[in-house]
């Protein structure tokens, strides 16, 4: 399951723009994405691939709950802040994915995370989620063989995220990760969190009380072990804590198309034509091989 936007943003910033003339179209994100996919497919031999897509990068229903959600990334209107040279490549990326036999899958009013969450939930044969987004750690499930191939350090330095990884790094289980993120907040998504509660305190609360509902119940119990300072902060954040979990947790029951049952079947002629037209033939050859 590809978090496609996460990958093409990484490709755009990680692959040099080698245009030789000012009027040549930018292609570094597209070629970089193809090279990433070639490496992933070569090294992991997936039985099938789904390119999950942001049909709405900032769904209104999430904004209605937390107004600051991704607010700092809005360029104008409701469009995401994105370099023009990357924006120009989105149609090329879509066309290349279609040519590969991996057409993007998006659901109106939802993010790629929600598409990924749904496929990961309904899969019955193990799933690798390829992303640079920690939010998807909430999907990790050893029993169902769902793990994250975390690309924050680059595609050549993938971190394999399983339950032990999440526990060692954050002190919580994957099923507690979304609640920890709610308490801690996430500046990259515009989530304020609860003042005075960082990652370690959030993890400690969840270990003591199980989940966010357990923490909230403990806040109302004067005999619980929550310190007066933390109790006061949690009480003051009641409205946020009521709304944020729905924003942070990925949707897992979208009406997605049936997952492919085998490896992608590329349209070689289309891919070669794209490679020739945009000067990315080397990347096309690598992924076809």
Model features per residue range: what roles?
Residues 1-130, 134-156, 241-257, 261:
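Noncatalytic, basic helical substrate-engagement surface that gates or grips nucleic-acid strands
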Residues 45-50, 81, 143, 160-289:
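Non-catalytic nucleic-acid-binding/docking modules located in mid-to-C-terminal regions
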């Amino acid at each position: 399951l590809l978090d496609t936007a996460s990958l093409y943003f990484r490709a755009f910033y990680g692959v040099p723009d080698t245009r030789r003339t000012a009027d040549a179209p930018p292609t570094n994100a597209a070629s970089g994405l193809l090279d990433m996919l070639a490496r992933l497919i070569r090294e992991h031999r997936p039985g099938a691939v789904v390119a999950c897509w942001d049909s709405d990068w900032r769904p209104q229903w999430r904004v209605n709950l937390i107004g600051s959600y991704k607010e700092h990334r809005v360029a104008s209107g409701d469009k995401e802040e994105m370099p023009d040279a990357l924006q120009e490549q989105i149609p090329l990326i879509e066309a290349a994915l279609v040519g590969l036999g991996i057409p993007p899958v998006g659901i109106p009013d939802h993010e790629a995370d929600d598409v990924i969450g749904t496929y990961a939930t309904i899969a019955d044969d193990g799933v690798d989620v390829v992303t640079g987004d920690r939010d998807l750690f909430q999907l990790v499930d050893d029993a169902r063989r769902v793990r994250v191939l975390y690309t924050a350090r680059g595609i050549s330095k993938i971190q394999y995220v399983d339950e032990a990884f999440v526990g060692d790094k954050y002190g919580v289980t994957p099923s507690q990760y979304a609640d920890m993120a709610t308490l801690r907040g996430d500046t990259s998504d515009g989530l304020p969190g609860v003042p005075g509660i960082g990652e370690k305190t959030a993890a400690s609360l969840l270990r003591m009380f199980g989940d966010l509902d357990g923490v909230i119940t403990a806040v109302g119990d004067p005999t619980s072990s929550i310190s007066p300072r933390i109790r006061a902060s949690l009480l003051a954040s009641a409205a946020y804590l009521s709304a944020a979990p729905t924003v942070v947790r990925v949707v897992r029951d979208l009406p997605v198309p049936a997952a492919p049952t085998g490896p992608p079947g590329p349209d070689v002629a289309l891919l070669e034509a794209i490679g020739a037209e945009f000067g990315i033939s080397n990347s096309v050859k690598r992924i076809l091989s």
